[in-house]
């Protein structure tokens, strides 16, 4: 986060602010652990950490507020959103971080720096659950159950919601006010009698749901003499650590776990003083359902939980209240999020005893990411957060690991004209010759459960870590990782022989992809100005094709004499992509039509305008260089000229392509071995 005259940069997005918002946004950024106060132009850091801590403490103190219920109503008159429900607060938190429209689909900035390749599941989650729940539609009376494979992002998603809510309550839009001294940080509006709630709605436009808790009902009479307007209200800030507005429940041994973990328990230190278990002062309202009031509760491994714990959720989700001790039903407004895997969920719904809970649950699938580029970003993030971030990972290493992983998650296309690699490229947004967006949509609709199985990111990162430690050097490449992935399959107890065979095939496919990438990389390094060489060859080819199709002659650049189109040059390029003698005429005409179409649209046909032609140019360039590369890279005792060339190529790989000297030399040796096969 850093400030400017116009706004505040926070969480990689720009949020316009005015002076009154700066304070809360500063706290928002600090609470989100993103505080970097610096000059926008120079990047100069202005404060050391102790100064930041002091400033954070001072600003947090300034955000605190305390006043009477009457003064709270004045705040509501100015800022009616303060009284929003828990579901509404979560939705607005996501919305306020920014929403982008990409190809007709919504992408939420709130999730963008932690969850990759899950745009569709996240859009479904927000638009089919959070948005209607924020509008008080019936979906808010459901437990949100995230279902997906291991390491698919379920826990990360829930953690983001929890951390985000903590930070959001420091902002003006996310402010939460509660009755002071209430262990459940209860909504002050619960004090308004039911008979006056319609009048309150007419005046403020705010609906009130829920009843005053037994403890606050007693306090209202005994401490304030029934005078609602004098009850003290305070601003509260959600914190999982302080058990304010965010709760987490994790099942343990059914024999030892007590329902009090959810709903609170009798306070044995005060029971003698107050003399009755039905006296709310002799009860500890410190269960997870109590503490998560106004915010959210994470129910870990919900489907493994003992049934007696789940029944409390029936009333809470449907009616907004739960039973605790010898009291009337206690109102609670909270989002309940649970997560599970597909196997546990199938087992749960097959049990007839759980039918009552089925209708109280809305299941949101969270599959694995199916885009190789996004998978690569996941690995980059995980490595950045590890202790091996200083190890040099050669270019394309993580990309090849990602390709392998995605191939294990994809299902074989039902149509015979497309293979798994082409399907992966289509999913990744690449243009694949002969396939359209309609074909992509058809592929995506073939299987409803695609992405619910395959290799998980943690396995890949574990194998990369193993490679780094075993190799005991500060550099690894794609071949090292593929070998480690292959070896790891033998140690993976849950992989059947059938799956192992499939995964080994995926490693072979990923290896072929790497072979092509490696050859192109070396090719670019050998040609000093690769793009210029490719452009020159392309222009030469297009001039000849145009002359051929129009039955014209070309001019010799030296003598100026008319000459026939260079058939040898054209065929040497076309043969690289399998264009036969019979097909050459139609291919050339198709190129000319494409050039005309570009010209009509005011565009220039260039090296990147035709996938197959680009591939042909690349292969032709490499074919011309093949012998040079082969001799240079495979000679055990290179002469002075060859050595100079190798050093030049290594330097170019290091300076322009992101290699270090070790990985550059390994790449050259590998490509040399490929060409000598």
Tell me the role of every PLM-derived stretch.
Residues 76, 80-677:
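Conserved ASCE/P-loop NTPase catalytic core
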Residues 21-22, 27-46:
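Short, Lys/Arg-enriched N-terminal segments with co-localized hydrophobic residues
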Residues 46-80:
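Long, basic/Gly/Ser/Thr-rich N-terminal segments
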Residues 3, 15, 20-23:
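Short hydrophobic targeting helices and cationic amphipathic motifs
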């Amino acid at each position: 986060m850093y400030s400017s005259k116009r706004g505040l940069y926070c969480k990689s997005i720009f949020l316009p602010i005015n002076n009154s918002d700066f304070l809360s946004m500063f706290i928002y950024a600090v609470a989100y652990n993103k505080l970097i106060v610096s000059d926008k132009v120079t990047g100069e850091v202005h404060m050391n950490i102790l100064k930041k801590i002091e400033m954070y403490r001072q600003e947090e103190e300034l955000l605190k507020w305390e006043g009477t219920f009457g003064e709270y109503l004045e705040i509501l008159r100015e800022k009616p959103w303060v009284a929003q429900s828990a579901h509404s607060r979560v939705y607005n938190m996501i919305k306020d971080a920014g929403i982008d429209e990409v190809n007709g689909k919504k992408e939420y900035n709130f999730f963008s720096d932690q969850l990759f390749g899950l745009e569709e599941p996240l859009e479904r989650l927000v638009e089919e659950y959070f948005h209607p729940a924020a509008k008080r539609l019936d979906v808010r009376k459901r437990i949100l159950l995230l279902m997906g494979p291991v390491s698919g992002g379920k826990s990360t998603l829930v953690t983001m919601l929890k951390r985000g809510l903590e930070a959001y309550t420091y902002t003006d839009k996310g402010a939460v006010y509660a009755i002071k001294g209430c262990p459940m940080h209860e909504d002050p509006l619960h004090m308004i009698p039911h008979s006056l709630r319609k009048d309150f709605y007419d005046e403020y436009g705010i609906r009130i749901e829920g009843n005053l808790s037994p403890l606050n009902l007693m306090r209202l009479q005994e401490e304030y003499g029934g005078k609602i307007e004098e009850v003290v209200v305070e601003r509260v800030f959600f914190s999982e650590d302080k058990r304010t507005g965010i709760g987490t429940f994790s099942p343990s041994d059914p024999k030892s776990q007590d329902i009090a973990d959810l709903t609170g328990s009798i306070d044995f230190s005060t029971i003698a003083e107050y003399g009755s278990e039905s006296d709310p002062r002799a009860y500890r309202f410190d269960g997870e359902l109590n503490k998560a009031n106004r915010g959210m509760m994470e129910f870990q491994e919900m489907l493994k939980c003992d049934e007696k714990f789940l029944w409390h959720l029936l009333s809470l989700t449907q009616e907004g209240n739960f039973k605790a001790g010898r009291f009337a039903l206690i109102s609670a407004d909270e989002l309940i999020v649970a997560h599970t895997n597909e196997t546990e969920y199938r087992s749960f719904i097959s049990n007839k005893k759980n039918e009552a809970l089925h209708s109280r649950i809305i299941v949101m699938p969270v599959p694995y990411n199916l885009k190789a580029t996004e998978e690569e970003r996941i690995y980059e993030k995980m490595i950045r957060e590890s202790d091996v971030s200083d190890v040099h990972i050669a270019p394309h290493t993580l990309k090849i690991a990602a390709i392998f992983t995605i191939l294990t998650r994809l299902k074989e296309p039902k149509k015979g004209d497309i293979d798994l690699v082409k399907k992966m490229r289509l999913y990744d947004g690449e243009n694949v010759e002969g396939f359209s967006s309609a074909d992509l949509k058809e592929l995506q609709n073939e299987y409803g459960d695609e992405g619910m199985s395959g290799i998980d990111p943690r396995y890949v990162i574990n194998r990369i870590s193993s490679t780094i430690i075993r190799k005991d050097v500060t550099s690894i490449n794609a071949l090292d990782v593929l070998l480690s992935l292959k070896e790891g399959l033998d140690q993976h107890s849950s992989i059947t022989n059938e799956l192992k065979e499939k995964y080994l095939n995926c490693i072979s496919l990923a290896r072929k992809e790497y072979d092509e990438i490696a050859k192109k990389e070396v090719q670019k390094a050998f040609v000093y100005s690769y793009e210029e060489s490719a452009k020159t060859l392309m222009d030469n080819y297009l001039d000849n094709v145009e002359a051929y199709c129009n039955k014209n002659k070309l001019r010799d650049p030296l003598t100026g004499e008319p000459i026939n189109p260079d058939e040898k040059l054209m065929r040497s390029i076309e043969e690289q992509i399998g264009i036969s003698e019979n097909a050459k005429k139609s291919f050339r005409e198709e190129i000319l039509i494409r050039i005309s179409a570009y010209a009509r649209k005011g565009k220039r046909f260039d090296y990147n305008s035709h996938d197959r032609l680009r591939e042909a140019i690349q292969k032709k360039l490499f074919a011309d260089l093949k012998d040079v590369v082969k001799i240079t890279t495979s000679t055990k005792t290179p002469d002075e000229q060859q050595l100079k060339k190798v050093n030049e190529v290594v330097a170019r790989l290091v300076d322009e392509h992101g290699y270090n000297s070790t990985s550059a030399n390994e790449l050259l040796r590998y490509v040399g071995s490929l060409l000598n096969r």
